[in-house]
Amino acid sequence: MTKMSNLPNDLAEEVLSRVSLTSLRNVRLTCKDWNTLSKGESFAKNHLGYQAIVAAKEKEFMMVLMMDFRVYLIRVNVHNDIESCIKPEGELISLGDEVDVSQVFHCDGLLLCITEDNEDNAKVVLWNPYWGQTRWIESTNNFHKLDMYTYALGYKKSSKSSRSYKILRFIDFSPTCSEFKIYNINSDSWKVLDVSPDWKIDSYIRGVSLKGNTYWIARERHGYGHTFLVCFDFTRERFRSRLPLPSQPCVLDTVSLSSVREEQLAVLFQCSSTLEMQIWVTTKIEPNAVLWNSKVFLAVDMHSLKFQFQVRASSFFIDEEKRVVVVFDKEKRYLASSRNKAYIVGVDGTWEQVDLGMSVDKFVYPLVCSYVPSLVHF
């Protein structure tokens, strides 16, 4: 009987291409030849091609879930029964079990992770989970030991096949506590940007990366008046003009951004007084222009759920075919619950919840973002 380790390369490649993404690390540790094979471009293309075919056939989304300071890969299929619609693929462990991840951002298959140690010192690491490649970024916290900075990951598209990846980091609390810097992956260097915005991005607002640029919900610098989108253009290395939202939220409303197929933006609004939730999707989104679909994607009365999604922490994604939204939050029976939940809400207002388990910290919320594996090396 032929052992797996003795198979010809083409046959071994065909067999190993069926291995899940989170099992690749074990494959690479099993056999030296498999390690070499699995790190080749030919295998990677076949492997990711097979995974994409399976996902399309099963109507699955591949997502990254940050929960309890760890990063997981999950597959979501809202066409399945509620018990099996969210399937954990496994923990992405290239950073090591001793590393606590407090923030994660996705762009083009790369993850930008902000980590913390026992003394609350923050560190920045760029990570390609597919290759298991990491780069720790040297940085300084000029204003406070705790990391109160806002981060974004994007790229400058030099040609059809060449992309230059960059990291934006800023803090903007006051004229004496303001700093905007950009890090170039290729040159391994930081550069200070001259930015004096007339708007403000609250520190808890998460940006969404789309086509190499990052979008945030922003507001007037003074007071809580008009709300809008702002985009950081990584090619020009500057913020672009304000972009309109399809609706204006009140101060205590929940507002959150998400990407759709890596092509469009979606925004979730939930009114704090009526609990009505609306989701709108763009038909065009560029750094200096946005068009919103004239018809709301989903508008439902959430009184039956009897709570408002977390203003500062909720993350979500939509399934266009089934017209549902999946929101990741906490259980709402208590003021500060220790159970993580995923809420699946349909266009008719019906909803179901998936229990994601007990949380180690009742004040740390689950975070989900889209994920498409990448062959990029840095």
From Swiss-Prot:
PROSITE patterns according to UniProt: FBOX
Transmembrane intervals: none
One protein family per Pfam: FBA_1
Top-rank lineage group of the source organism: Eukaryota
Positions of the F-box domain: 1-47
SMART domains, per the entry: FBOX (SM00256)
PANTHER family linked: F-BOX ASSOCIATED UBIQUITINATION EFFECTOR FAMILY PROTEIN, OS09G0372900 PROTEIN-RELATED
Protein name: Putative F-box protein At3g24580
